[in-house]
Amino acid sequence: MRPFQFSKPRFLISLVILVACGFAATAFAEEPKEWLGKNLDDLVSLYRQFHASPELSFREEKTAARLAEELKKLGVEVTTGVGRQGVVGILKNGAGPTLLIRTDLDALPVTEKTQLPYASKVSAKDKDGNDVGVMHACGHDIHITCLIGTARYLASHKDDWRGTVMFIGQPAEEIGAGALAMLDDGLFKKFPKPDFGLALHVDSSMQSGKVGYRAGYILANVDSVDITMRGKGGHGAYPHTTIDPIVQAAQLVVNLQTIVSRENSPFEPAVVTVGSIRGGTKHNIIADSCHLKLTVRSYSDKVRKLLLEAIKRKANAVAAGAGAPEPMIEFSDATPATRNDESLVS
């Protein structure tokens, strides 16, 4: 997984500034692109600092503190600790609508191997106690920089717009828990409920300088599935005396691929990916269990339901065919699809 590069970051930050100002703007005294050209070096430096100092989900203490510090410098009213590490900044500028601009804060348990001068050298314990590298491999460092750049422009060009801007630093996006934590902590009870919401996500598959957007679905439902295939362990030289969970897991991996290709309509986007298989400890020992971790992506509720029910059915069928106990199946990290408001996008 390669990091996102700041080859042409001006397009990302300009996009946010233009849309943020556009909801209540007059003529610009200074065009956002002109301002960005003057301030780009400082923003790139800021990005590299965030990139070199990543933090895992719900551990974003330094990241949240730095975001809060940058916003306070601009005269933004800042509240920290919303939903644990969440940051809320309010910039008021007269009567007008309220716009929410949001960034995610957390990084991934990925070891960086880019050899860049600002590469992450951070390591940590994951939730299972394993030693892992930590990296902004999903571009949240860029997202934070875009938000700060937008805040700097808006704070220094108040004659160009009217209204209230709410800047949100959301923790734990990667585990699908941070937004809910902020809502449960009274986000829209303690602070204004916005008329509009704006966010972006970098995409390394797009040509540098291009921006992609559309009305309707833009990001998929995300479901995580943990499956434990159970069996009867024993010696590898006597497999006939065992019920091999690793063979079950192998069969299940293949069977799962027929859900998308044979049970789902080709006109409905869907993905079922097995990201991890773990079972056994030695060459000559058949384990008692084998664990699989899946990610499931879809847009509609109908397809989402089809995929999850089919996964459960196929796992149970494999176990039954092997004469094994029923597998343990856990669904978690459910995050609904993002659907862009057609009136705002068109």
PLM segments and residue spans:
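N-terminal secretory signal peptides that target proteins for export/translocation
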Residues: 1-9
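Bacterial N-terminal signal peptides
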Residues: 12-24
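Acidic/His- and Gly-rich active-site-bordering loop/insert found
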Residues: 30-136, 145-162
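Extracytoplasmic/secreted envelope proteins and their assembly/folding machinery
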Residues: 40-47, 64, 68, 151, ...
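Metal-dependent amide/peptide-bond hydrolase catalytic core
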Residues: 73, 250-346
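Structural recognition of the beta-strand scaffold that forms the well-ordered cores
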Residues: 79, 98-102, 166-169, 197-199, ...
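Histidine/acidic-residue-rich, glycine-tolerant segments that coordinate divalent metal ions
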Residues: 119, 123-135, 141-142, 154, ...
